[in-house]
A protein has these predicted regions:
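Short, well-structured N-terminal submotif of metal-dependent ribonuclease cores
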Residues: 1-36
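A secondary-structure boundary/capping signal
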Residues: 8, 37, 109-110, 125
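Conserved nucleotide-binding/hydrolysis micro-motifs of P-loop NTPases
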Residues: 11-12, 41, 112-113
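Short, flexible loop segments at the rims of nucleotide/cofactor-binding pockets, characterized by
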Residues: 12, 81-87
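Short, glycine/charged-enriched secondary-structure capping and boundary segments
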Residues: 19-22, 49, 119-123
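PIN-domain endoribonuclease scaffold, especially VapC-family toxins
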Residues: 35-79, 148-165, 169
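Acidic, metal-binding active-site segment of PIN/NYN-like and related structure-specific nucleases
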Residues: 91-124
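Acidic, PIN/NYN-like endoribonuclease modules and their adjacent C-terminal/linker elements
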Residues: 111-191
């Protein structure tokens, strides 16, 4: 069964998280679909602009286009008045959209979402979601890790792939990626 994953803005704001979710989606199309809203995209781009005030306009256009190429659905409408018990009232629109698109998973780095028996989706951090994906299809995650390694190795004066994942809040997944890269290089896994 293909999982419907609603992606929150904070995932798109992080280049590392954005790249991984989009690359995993492209590598494993039968496993999950990505859904979001214009509101979430606007929030992500607003935050990106706030964080990088000197970025060229084309940079945000490129980021938006790259996101849209990976998204299966940009939800056009949703009922904003659905019941919501989360800690941040400004996140109501995320919950409402996740409900409207019948998401199985809400992918967010926000700790303010509460799961209950009434919530029709499960809340996952990227670290947890990426690790679950690795549990299901480790060979496909390894393929994405190899693509990512090629990109990161071509970037001068940048931190490594593992450190980027740790800095993005994915320490467990970073360890798994390091294991995939060791395996792909022929180095025996650490015990």
């Amino acid at each position: 069964v293909v999982q419907r994953v609603f992606v929150d803005a904070n995932v798109f704001v992080s280049r590392t998280l954005r790249d991984w979710i989009c690359l995993l989606r492209a590598e494993i199309p039968a496993m999950f679909q990505l859904h979001t809203t214009e509101d979430v995209l606007a929030e992500a781009l607003y935050t990106l602009r706030r964080n990088r005030k000197d970025a060229d306009g084309g940079e945000t256009v490129h980021i938006r286009q790259a996101i849209l190429e990976s998204i299966d659905e940009v939800l056009a409408d949703f009922n904003g008045s659905v019941a919501y018990s989360g800690a941040d009232p400004d996140d109501r629109h995320v919950h409402a959209a996740a409900v409207a698109c019948q998401a199985d998973v809400l992918l967010t780095e926000d700790q303010g979402f509460e799961e209950s028996d009434l919530t029709p989706y499960e809340v996952y951090s990227c670290d947890d979601f990426f690790c679950l994906t690795d549990d299901a299809v480790p060979d496909r995650v390894r393929a994405v890790a190899m693509k990512q390694l090629k990109y990161w190795n071509a970037q001068p004066r940048r931190k490594g792939l593992k450190q980027a994942l740790i800095d993005a809040g994915c320490p467990d997944f970073a360890e798994r990626v390091e294991g995939h890269l060791r395996l792909a290089s022929g180095v025996r896994p650490r015990h």
